[in-house]
C-alpha cells in the first residue's frame, strides 16, 4: 500500500492506494469517529462492493446504512441529492455521522456535497471505484451537482477525512469508463510533468489493458500532482485552475450533448485536444506537441473529434463556467508540455479552433 498526504494543515488527510483496501477496517478506524456511518453508492457499484465496506464498518462496531442512487451523470442533480438527505434524516444521523462515498466521480461529488450541507458539515470518506475518481475527483474537496444550464455550478469545497483507492475495483470497469479515467491521467502529465506524459505514451497499451502495477503507478503519480496543486491553492484562487485543462471545452460538450451522452472523461479528452490546438494557434506549443496530445488521447480510446454544436453554441455554453469573469471566457492552455496557465483568448482564434475541432481527417473513422 502507498500512502500520500494532502497537506492542508489541520485539514490534511491521507490518500491510501493499494489492493484489498475495501475490506480493511483499520484504514477506516481513524476516520469514522461517530457511531453511525452511511454508505452512498449506486446501482452498478453497490452490488459489487457495498457488502465488503459494510462488513468493515460493522467490524468497528458501527451502525451502517447504505443509500443506493441511480448510476450516471444524468442523475447528478437536486432530486438525487435529496435521496441522500432523506436517508440521513430518516436514520437520525447526527453531526458525527460519517458518509462514505463508494463509487465514481458522480457518487463522490454528490456525497461530498451532502456532507458539506447536512447539519452544516459532517465528515466523509472517499472510496473511489473508477479510474477517473481515483486519479482526480476524489482528491481536493470539490463537491457539487449539475444544473441544466451548467456543470458543477452548485457545490462547495469540503475536504474528505481520507481517500481510499482500491486498485482492484478497476478490474470491473467497462473499457469506456477506464478510457474516461485515462483522460485525467493524461491531463496531469500535460499540465505538470512532461516526463510523466512520456511514460504514459510508452505504456499506453498495458494501461489500456489495466495492468495492475502500471495502473498503481499512474494513480500514485496523478494523485501526487493533484495533491501538490491542492496544497498550494485549495480553493482555486489561481494555480489550481490548471487542473481544468480541457474542461472548459469539455463541460460545453457535456452540457451541449446532454449530461450522460458523453462521459466526463471523454469530453475532457476531446477538450484537451481542442485546448492543445488553441495553445498552438496562439504560438505557445509547437506542432509536434499538439500532435502528441491528440495521438495519446486517441491511443487511450478517447474521442478526438468534437460534436458539431456550432461555434456560437459552444461559446454560449463556455460562458457558463466557474472560471469566467464578466462574461469573459478563460482557458487553461499550455506554454509547453508540462506547464499550463490560464488566459483569455482572441475570438478569432477560438472560433478557428472550434471549426477545426469538428473536422474528421480523411483517414480517421468517425467518432461515436
Swiss-Prot record:
Cellular localisation: Cytoplasm
Keywords from the named record: Amino-acid biosynthesis, Aromatic amino acid biosynthesis, Cobalt, Cytoplasm, Lyase, Metal-binding, NAD, Nucleotide-binding, Zinc
Binding locations of NAD(+): 71-76, 105-109, 129-130, 142, 151, 169-172
Cofactor(s) needed: Co(2+); Zn(2+); NAD(+)
Amino-acid positions noted as binding Zn(2+) in the UniProt annotation, renumbered to this chain: 184, 247, 264
GO BP of this protein: amino acid biosynthetic process; aromatic amino acid family biosynthetic process; chorismate biosynthetic process
Record's catalysed reaction(s): 7-phospho-2-dehydro-3-deoxy-D-arabino-heptonate = 3-dehydroquinate + phosphate
Biological role: Catalyzes the conversion of 3-deoxy-D-arabino-heptulosonate 7-phosphate (DAHP) to dehydroquinate (DHQ).
Entry protein name: 3-dehydroquinate synthase
Organism (species): Cupriavidus necator (strain ATCC 17699 / DSM 428 / KCTC 22496 / NCIMB 10442 / H16 / Stanier 337) (Ralstonia eutropha)
Amino acid at each position: 500500500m502507498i500512502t500520500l498526504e494532502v497537506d492542508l494543515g489541520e485539514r490534511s488527510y491521507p490518500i491510501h492506494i493499494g489492493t484489498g483496501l475495501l475490506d480493511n477496517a483499520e484504514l477506516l478506524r481513524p476516520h469514522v469517529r461517530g457511531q453511525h456511518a452511511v454508505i452512498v453508492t449506486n446501482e452498478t457499484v453497490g452490488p459489487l462492493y457495498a457488502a465488503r465496506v459494510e462488513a468493515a464498518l460493522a467490524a468497528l462496531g458501527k451502525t451502517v446504512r447504505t443509500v443506493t442512487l441511480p448510476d450516471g451523470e444524468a442523475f447528478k442533480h437536486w432530486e438525487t441529492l435529496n435521496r441522500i438527505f432523506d436517508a440521513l434524516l430518516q436514520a437520525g444521523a447526527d453531526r458525527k455521522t460519517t458518509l462514505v462515498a463508494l463509487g465514481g466521480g458522480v457518487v463522490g461529488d454528490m456525497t461530498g456535497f451532502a456532507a458539506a450541507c447536512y447539519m452544516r458539515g459532517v465528515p466523509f470518506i472517499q472510496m473511489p471505484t473508477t479510474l477517473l475518481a481515483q486519479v482526480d475527483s476524489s482528491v481536493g474537496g470539490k463537491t457539487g451537482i449539475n444544473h441544466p444550464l451548467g456543470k458543477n455550478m452548485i457545490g462547495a469545497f469540503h475536504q474528505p477525512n481520507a481517500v481510499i483507492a482500491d486498485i482492484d475495483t478497476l478490474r470491473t470497469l467497462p473499457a469506456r469508463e477506464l478510457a474516461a479515467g485515462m483522460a485525467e491521467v493524461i491531463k496531469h502529465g500535460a499540465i505538470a510533468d512532461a516526463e510523466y506524459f512520456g511514460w504514459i505514451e510508452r505504456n499506453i497499451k498495458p494501461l489500456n489493458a489495466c495492468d495492475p502495477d502500471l495502473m498503481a503507478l499512474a494513480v500514485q503519480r496523478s494523485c501526487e500532482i493533484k495533491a501538490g496543486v491542492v496544497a498550494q491553492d485549495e480553493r482555486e484562487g489561481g494555480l489550481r485552475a490548471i487542473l481544468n485543462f480541457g474542461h472548459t471545452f469539455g463541460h460545453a460538450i457535456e452540457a451541449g450533448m446532454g449530461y450522460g451522452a458523453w462521459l466526463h472523461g471523454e469530453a475532457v479528452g476531446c477538450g484537451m485536444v481542442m485546448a492543445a490546438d488553441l495553445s498552438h494557434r496562439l504560438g505557445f506549443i509547437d506542432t509536434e506537441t499538439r500532435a502528441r496530445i491528440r495521438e495519446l488521447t486517441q491511443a487511450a480510446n478517447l474521442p478526438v473529434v468534437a460534436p458539431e454544436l456550432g461555434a456560437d453554441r459552444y461559446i454560449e455554453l463556455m460562458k457558463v463556467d466557474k472560471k469566467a469573469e464578466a462574461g469573459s471566457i478563460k482557458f487553461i492552455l499550455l506554454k509547453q508540455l508540462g506547464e499550463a496557465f490560464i488566459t483569455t483568448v482572441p475570438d478569432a482564434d477560438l472560433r478557428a479552433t472550434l471549426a477545426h475541432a469538428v473536422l474528421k481527417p480523411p483517414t480517421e473513422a468517425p467518432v461515436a
